[in-house]
Structures are given as C-alpha cells and as structure tokens.
Curated annotation (Swiss-Prot):
Residues covered by region (G5): 155-157
Residue positions binding GTP: 16-23, 63-67, 125-128
Function description: An essential GTPase that binds both GDP and GTP, with rapid nucleotide exchange. Plays a role in 16S rRNA processing and 30S ribosomal subunit biogenesis and possibly also in cell cycle regulation and energy metabolism.
The family this protein is said to belong to: Belongs to the TRAFAC class TrmE-Era-EngA-EngB-Septin-like GTPase superfamily. Era GTPase family.
GO molecular function, one term: ribosomal small subunit binding
Residue ranges constituting the KH type-2 domain according to the UniProt record: 199-283
Subcellular location: Cytoplasm; Cell inner membrane
Name of the protein in its database record: GTPase Era
Quaternary structure (record): Monomer.
Length: 300
C-alpha cells in the first residue's frame, strides 16, 4: 500500500504516433501552453520536459516527437531516436492512442512500448466524441490483449476530460523521491527555445497544405531592454520557393506569423515583445547531420 502523503517525484514519458494529441495533453495537464501544437503531423521535434508540482507530488512529463516510419532524412532519424530514448529511464509511460483509429505508426509505437518494464498507461484520446461508449469495447479489448499489464484511461486531450483520473494513476506510480526541480519551474527548456517553437508553430498553422516540413527557427537575439523583450528570429528553409511562400504576397504572410507569435510570447514571457523575423535559405539542412547539430538537434 502506497503512502499518499509521501513526497513523490519521477519522469513520465508521453509517447504515440504523430498528431495523436500528446502535446495538447501535456498543455492541459500543466494548465498552460508550453508545447506547440498544430493539425500537422511531426509538429513536435524535440523531447521537452513539462514539470507539474502539486503539494507532495512532482511529475516531470517528457513530451516526445511522434514515432513514424520514415527514416528517409537525418531529421526523421533524429525525431525517432529522440522519441525512443524517452522510453528508457522513466518511471511511467503514457501511450496516447486514438479512440478507434489504428495505424502502422501506432503499431510501431506499440512494439516499442511492449518492451517497457515499468508501468504503462494507455490514454485513449478523443473519447468525448463517441456517444455510444460500447463502440469502444472491441478496440479496448484488443489493446488490453497487446498490453495486458497496462492501465486504460479514456481522455480528451482537447477538452481536458478525465485528466484528474489520469494524473491520479500517474501519481500512484511515481517513486518516493525529493523533488528534482523548484516548485515554480515548469520546463527545462530555455526561453530562446520556447520563442523559436512559437514561431515554428505559427508557420505550421499559417501554411496549411503549402507547408514545407523543411523549416526550422533559430533565435539570433533575445534581449530584455527596459520593459521590452527584443527577439530576432531566423526562419531557415531549404529552397527559394519555400522562402517566397513564408514571406507571402507583399510580406503579408510573414507579418501575420510575426503578429500571432508575438501575442503568444507576450503571454508566455509576461512582457512586451518586439519580434523581428527573417527568412534564410540553407539547402539540404534537414538531411545534413552537421547542420542539424548546429541548429540544436543534438546527436543523431
């Protein structure tokens, strides 16, 4: 029997295929926007910690890139390696799946999760959209057969439905430990990293079907001057055509990207923000391991 008053702290990996709701789930658990989201697969590229401290419990969530089948480019290999690494040395794994849809990429994640030694929680997302819950049963039964030791929790990452039950299960599995981070810290990532991610999110949301995935963002300046935070961001693409798409007709699109990113930055950093954006062509960066490392993508 666990001691409900004990101080507990541990790492919780959130894994799943691309675009299944992992980052949205993390944001709702934290009660604020930390991880960027869009309707496009592979929005998340890096592991990022989201830290939630409530009383004696500190859960350190690891938001991961969606595992996907393509290893075509160095960037794809980096994301898959990053997501797989998150399954090691964590105390709990949350495997996020769709309420009924199952893909080859879900199967890929399942095959990795089946080797996990510790507690696994299956978070069945978007269950609020099903009126007749009996429709879920065949899928849930099959999932339970694949992961017989996993606990199953139906949730809605978008609406925040049933997250209390999910967090209760997580807390139960965290080891007794002193807290690793101060109570008011919510992430391990720098403000520069968060600013770059916000710009990239707005690009992904603005471009829709025109979206070139070969885009990254580098913060060249991040400086507080008086009451204003000055941020210079460089948007890196692979081709001249992509540069033209991002800039848009008479610069209208990049202006919208900047306005939306600035609004979110002012909320996140609690400061007036002066944001300047530039676009640069760096051919083949997404398949160049040296370039990826220089842009903060770590070891491949």
């Amino acid at each position: 029997m666990t001691d409900s008053t004990a101080t507990r702290c541990g790492y919780v990996a959130i894994v799943g295929r691309p675009n299944v709701g992992k980052s949205t789930l993390l944001n709702h658990i934290l009660g604020q926007k930390l991880a960027i989201t869009s309707r496009k697969p592979q929005t998340t590229r890096h592991n990022m910690l989201g830290i939630k401290t409530e009383g004696a419990i500190q859960a350190i969530y690891v938001d991961t890139p969606g595992m996907h089948k393509s290893n075509e480019k160095a960037l794809n290999r980096y994301m898959n390696k990053t997501a797989s690494a998150a399954l090691k040395d964590v105390d709990v794994v949350i495997f996020v799946v769709d309420r009924t849809k199952w893909t080859d990429e879900d199967q890929l994640v399942l095959e990795r999760v089946q080797y996990v030694q510790g507690p696994v929680i299956l978070a069945i997302n978007k269950t609020d959209r099903i009126e007749d819950k009996a429709e879920l049963m065949p899928h849930l039964t099959w999932l339970q057969e694949q992961l017989p030791n996993a606990e199953i929790v139906p949730v809605s990452a978008q609406q925040g439905h049933n997250l209390e039950a999910l967090e209760g299960l997580i807390a139960k599995h965290l080891p007794e430990n002193d807290h690793f981070f101060p109570e008011d810290q919510i992430t391990d990532r720098s403000s520069r990293f968060l600013a770059a991610e916000l710009v990239r999110e707005k690009i992904m949301r603005q471009l829709g079907a025109e979206l070139p995935y070969q885009i990254t963002v580098e913060i060249e300046e991040f400086k507080q001057q008086g009451k204003t935070l000055h941020i210079h961001a460089l948007i890196i693409v692979e081709r001249d055509g992509q540069k033209k798409i991002i800039i848009g007709d008479k610069g209208e699109r990049i202006k919208r990207i900047g306005m939306e990113a600035r609004k979110d930055m002012e909320l996140l950093f609690d400061s007036k923000v002066m944001l300047n954006l530039w676009v640069k062509v760096k051919g083949g960066w997404s398949d160049d391991e040296r370039a990826l490392r220089s842009l903060g993508y770590g070891d491949l």
